[in-house]
């Protein structure tokens, strides 16, 4: 028996599009208005800083000769497909999980676009305290982390709340 897309978690795919538009739009603005390494202070402890990441989180494997571009692209595609299948198999009313999956897919696809189009991921958010700087990241990374945090949060909810 087939089910309506609107009755499945795929109903939340609109959030993937929103994440992609915001992420790719922010990266476009950085690429059009910043030279590599440019920094603009926004608030105390927060800068816009144009950086290129040829690896993964914290520049993992950034200096590995180029193969990592395709490796991380494959991971992004695989995770996106897996989460889309999970959304299809879940009910649209399971909001927390589906929102989490959509955020992760949107972030993964945003960074995938960068890897395939530019050969690197555009990063621009520089959080710091004093002289200590956290790794520069982007809005796709933020969406992925928020999605992962929602999945962890869902694990702590009582069973009754999960069945909604």
UniProtKB/Swiss-Prot annotation:
Pathway: Protein modification; lipoprotein biosynthesis (signal peptide cleavage). GO terms for biological process: proteolysis. GO terms for molecular function: aspartic-type endopeptidase activity. Pfam families: Peptidase_A8. The active site is at residues 123, 141. Keywords: Aspartyl protease, Cell inner membrane, Cell membrane, Hydrolase, Membrane, Protease, Transmembrane, Transmembrane helix. Its EC number is 3.4.23.36. It is found in: Cell inner membrane. Its main location: membrane. InterPro entries: Peptidase_A8. It is an enzyme of class 3 (hydrolase). It catalyses: Release of signal peptides from bacterial membrane prolipoproteins. Hydrolyzes -Xaa-Yaa-Zaa-|-(S,diacylglyceryl)Cys-, in which Xaa is hydrophobic (preferably Leu), and Yaa (Ala or Ser) and Zaa (Gly or Ala) have small, neutral side chains. It is a multi-pass membrane protein. GO terms for cellular component: plasma membrane. The chain crosses the membrane at residues 12-32, 70-90, 102-122, 137-157. This protein specifically catalyzes the removal of signal peptides from prolipoproteins. Belongs to the peptidase A8 family. HAMAP family: LspA. This is Lipoprotein signal peptidase. It comes from Shigella flexneri.
């Amino acid at each position: 028996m087939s089910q309506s897309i609107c009755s499945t978690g795929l109903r939340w795919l609109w959030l993937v599009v929103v994440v992609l538009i915001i992420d790719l739009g922010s990266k476009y603005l950085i690429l059009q208005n910043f030279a590599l390494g440019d920094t603009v202070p926004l608030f105390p402890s927060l800068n816009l800083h144009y950086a290129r990441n040829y690896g993964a989180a914290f520049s993992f494997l950034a200096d590995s000769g180029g193969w990592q571009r395709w490796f991380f692209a494959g991971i992004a595609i695989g995770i996106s497909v897996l989460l889309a299948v999970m959304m299809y198999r879940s009910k649209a009313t399971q909001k927390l999980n589906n929102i989490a999956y959509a955020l992760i897919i949107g972030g993964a696809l945003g960074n995938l676009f960068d890897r395939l189009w530019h050969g690197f991921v555009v990063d621009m958010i520089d959080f710091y305290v004093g002289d200590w700087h956290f790794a520069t990241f982007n809005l796709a990374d933020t969406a992925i982390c928020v999605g992962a945090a929602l999945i962890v949060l869902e694990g702590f909810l009582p069973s009754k709340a999960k069945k909604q």
